[in-house]
């Protein structure tokens, strides 16, 4: 191996590692499902009230995603990611002051704003390091790193709630402090990393960004992202409630259902990074959606632990690569408008607001079977989207 090749690989690793740590920080938003269940228990909230937390987090994706695409055109993708990390760190320190309803609303709002900015800017930043034929697999690996943070959240929260070690009286909220410190580390490493960016010829207006939705495939992809994140947040939040409703387990035990989901989502992201280099995105997407459909059927029909865990695992694995395939398809389809399309795709994460709200009302009306029915609608749409996927 030549010295120049070794130098290039070393340079690439020095740039990609800080970016992957940012993907880990991106996963902090998934603590909202775990946190909302603990807050619901602490404050005695209804399902509809508790589901306001994840809905509030993802509401900000609707507001901030497109303006972030415009901000990237002005200050660059890396600087925009740094801003998002600062906002995220601030949001994670807020719960150290208490767990009242207003404090948690403020924390989740800032967490949503920071994550909206981060997801809009970090995903296209990868295109400055990776060629288009490796984009889907690299984004999937980033989602794998993100999923590790998601998987650890319920474990850290449960440890904080039950440990005899001193956690400054925070209990399960020690989760926020640990993730805040990691956010500060990500800020330091990314700020010290040099990344060359391709600058746009001209800045875009909000109208020009939204105009991209007039392109049929971009609109279909936008709706696909909405369904993906709705299923993701919905399963994250609802899985423990299904266990509690049907088996009567306490939250500390039922919360393992969220861990099952993220274990399989993490495994799916890791394997997907390699599978997407071997088979077409369309075939892998179809297999993933069918796995979710089977998983939803198990959640709807079963009332014992093993099949419920199986269904949750199938949904986690199936949903693990949906985002990466849709996002990469959209970026390659509109390669001349990457920042704008990125903003629109991340705006689709607003589905994380729509789905939990609908699921909360459905669950209050007919039980958790109503929440499962709402998520199944999203899975059926993704089955339709499979037919529209292009070959890259």
Predicted regions and their residues:
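Intracellular juxtamembrane helix-capping segments at the cytosolic ends
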Residues: 117-131, 320-335
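Helix-loop-helix hairpin linking two adjacent transmembrane segments in secondary transporters
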Residues: 133, 137-194
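Extracytoplasmic
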Residues: 14-45, 123, 235-240
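Extracytoplasmic gate region of multi-pass secondary transporters
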Residues: 32-33, 214-259, 263-269
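Central cavity-lining transmembrane alpha-helices of secondary-active solute carriers
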Residues: 52-70, 259-271
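Helix-breaking motifs and short loop linkers at transmembrane-helix boundaries and internal kinks
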Residues: 44, 76, 97-102, 248, ...
């Amino acid at each position: 191996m030549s010295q120049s090749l070794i130098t290039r690989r070393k340079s690439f690793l020095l740039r990609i590692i800080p970016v992957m740590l940012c993907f880990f920080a991106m996963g902090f938003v998934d603590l909202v499902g775990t946190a909302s269940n603990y807050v619901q228990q602490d404050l005695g909230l209804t399902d509809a009230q508790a589901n306001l937390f994840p809905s509030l987090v993802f509401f900000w994706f609707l507001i901030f995603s497109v303006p972030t695409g415009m901000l990237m055109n002005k200050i660059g993708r890396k600087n925009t990611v740094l801003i998002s990390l600062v906002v995220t760190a601030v949001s994670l320190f807020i719960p150290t002051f208490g767990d009242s309803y207003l404090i948690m609303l403020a924390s989740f709002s800032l967490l949503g704003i920071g994550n909206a900015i981060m997801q809009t800017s970090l995903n296209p930043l990868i295109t400055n390091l990776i060629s288009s034929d490796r984009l889907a697999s690299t984004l999937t690996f980033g989602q794998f790193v993100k999923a590790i943070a998601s998987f650890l959240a319920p474990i850290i929260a449960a440890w904080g709630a039950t440990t005899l070690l001193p956690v400054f009286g925070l209990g399960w909220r020690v989760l926020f402090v640990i993730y805040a410190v990691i956010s500060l580390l990500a800020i330091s490493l990314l700020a010290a990393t040099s990344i060359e960016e391709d600058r746009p010829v001209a800045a875009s207006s909000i109208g020009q960004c939204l105009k991209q939705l007039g392109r049929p495939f971009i609109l279909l992809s936008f709706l696909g992202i909405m369904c993906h994140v709705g299923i993701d947040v919905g399963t994250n939040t609802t899985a423990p409630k299904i266990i509690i409703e049907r088996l009567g387990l306490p939250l500390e035990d039922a919360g393992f259902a969220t861990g099952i989901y993220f274990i399989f989502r993490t495994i799916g992201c890791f394997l997907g990074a390699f599978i997407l280099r071997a088979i077409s995105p369309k075939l892998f997407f179809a297999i993933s959606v069918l796995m979710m459909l089977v998983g939803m059927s198990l959640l709807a029909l079963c009332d014992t632990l093993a099949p419920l865990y199986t269904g949750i695992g199938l949904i986690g694995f199936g949903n693990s690569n949906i985002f990466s395939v849709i996002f990469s398809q959209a970026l390659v389809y509109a390669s001349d408008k990457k920042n704008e399309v990125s903003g629109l795709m991340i705006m689709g994460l607003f589905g994380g607001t729509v789905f939990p709200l609908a699921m909360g009302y459905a669950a209050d009306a007919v039980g958790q079977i109503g929440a499962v029915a709402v998520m199944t609608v999203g899975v059926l749409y993704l089955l339709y989207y499979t037919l529209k996927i292009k070959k890259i």
